[in-house]
């Protein structure tokens, strides 16, 4: 997630406390030895979850509390989540999303912010949009306007586009969802005339593929992990601990032909295998190997775009712009 404000007629991204342009949409509940509860949001929450998985492995304390919950994918549902570290019995997806919005709001400290424009996937239905509005109210915003993400992308692109009018295809491969949208631009007016997507296709899925097809098989070849195969939550803790390395290497391979990772160099403990040997992840992944692994995920996105074009009797050469988000 990210937040921006208008300054001198320009949209300016507000950096996080870690000087990053984006904030992980992650919420973590903790409780110290005194029983005091707190909520961490963003990179601190994300790092804490990785640390939990690693600590669980190193101490042999495995339980069902270790794992990720993709609460943003459940917006508008009646799902609730609970654990012993929460200050109240349970949280729903809107309340968790509100914690992320509160953190983003805190990044603007030079003015009082009461109104917000929140972008949502084009595939969001009414109940999901209502849930987003509710999250904004919980976060303290008095006014909230929702804007479809393809429209937001087109608005940003259109500011510098040489050819304004025509039909644009927005290819929005996000962290957790994929949206394809056809946008008609005429006399400066943007309108989405058809959308298609997958609420369970995004960067997180790519990380899972890297873990399941590359990192996990690598460790199985190096260590004796039979008990991890037999105990569901033991394996889940190790898989969760590998998601950090997977994401780090995937991002690195966007700019390089190969990427190295070493838990030993980072002083990370992944526990022991069934023979009592320390588990260390020492691996080099090439861009070619990564692309081979994640190709099926991108094929899903491409096929969604093909179906969208076919449904509207359009061919690729009839598009004036392709916008990659």
Model segments located where?
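Gly/Thr-rich phosphate-binding beta-strand-loop-beta motif of the actin/hexokinase/Hsp70
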Residues: 1-13, 159-193, 324
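Short acidic-glycine loop/turn motifs at beta-strand connectors
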Residues: 5-10, 28-36, 184-188, 272-274
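Phosphate-binding loop and its immediate beta->loop->alpha context
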Residues: 9-144, 148, 202-262, 282
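Phosphate/ATP-binding catalytic cores across multiple sugar-kinase/actin-like superfamilies
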Residues: 96-111, 150-162, 292-322
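Alpha-helix capping and helix-loop boundary segments enriched in small/acidic/polar residues
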Residues: 123, 127, 165-169, 197-205, ...
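Small-residue (GG/TT-enriched) beta-loop-alpha framework at ligand/catalytic clefts
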Residues: 137, 141-156, 168, 172-177, ...
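Secondary-structure transition/capping motifs at alpha-helix termini
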Residues: 138-145, 186-190, 221, 311-317
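Helical "lid/coupling" subdomains associated with nucleotide-phosphate turnover
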Residues: 214-216, 252-325
């Amino acid at each position: 997630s990210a937040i921006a404000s208008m300054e001198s007629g320009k949209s300016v991204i507000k950096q996080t406390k870690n000087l990053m342009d984006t904030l992980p949409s992650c919420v973590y509940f903790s409780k110290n030895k005194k029983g005091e509860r707190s909520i961490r949001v963003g990179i601190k929450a994300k790092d804490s979850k990785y640390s939990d998985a690693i600590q669980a492995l190193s101490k042999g304390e495995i339980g069902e509390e270790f794992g990720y919950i993709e609460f943003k994918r459940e917006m508008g549902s009646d799902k609730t989540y609970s654990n012993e570290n929460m200050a109240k019995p349970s949280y729903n997806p809107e309340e968790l999303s509100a914690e992320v919005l509160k953190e983003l709001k805190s990044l603007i400290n030079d003015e009082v912010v009461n109104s917000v424009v929140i972008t949502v996937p084009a595939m969001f239905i009414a109940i999901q949009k209502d849930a987003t509005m509710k999250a904004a109210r919980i976060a303290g915003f008095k006014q909230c306007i929702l804007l479809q993400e393809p429209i937001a992308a087109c608005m940003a692109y259109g500011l510098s586009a040489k050819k304004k009018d025509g039909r644009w295809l927005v290819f929005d491969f996000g962290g957790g969802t994929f949206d394809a949208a056809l946008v008609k631009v005429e006399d400066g007016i943007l309108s989405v005339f058809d959308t298609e997507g997958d609420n369970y296709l995004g960067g997180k899925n790519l990380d899972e593929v890297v873990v399941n097809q590359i990192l996990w098989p690598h460790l199985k070849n190096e260590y004796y992990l039979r008990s991890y195969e037999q105990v569901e939550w033991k394996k889940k803790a190790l898989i969760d601990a590998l998601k950090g390395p997977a994401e780090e290497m995937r991002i690195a391979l966007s700019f390089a032909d190969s990427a190295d990772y070493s838990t030993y160099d980072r002083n990370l403990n992944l526990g022991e295998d069934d023979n009592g040997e320390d588990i260390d992840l020492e691996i080099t992944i090439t861009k070619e190997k990564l692309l081979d692994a994640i190709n099926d995920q991108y094929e899903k996105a491409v096929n969604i775009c093909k179906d969208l074009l076919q449904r509207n009797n359009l061919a690729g050469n009839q598009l004036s712009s392709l916008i990659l988000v």
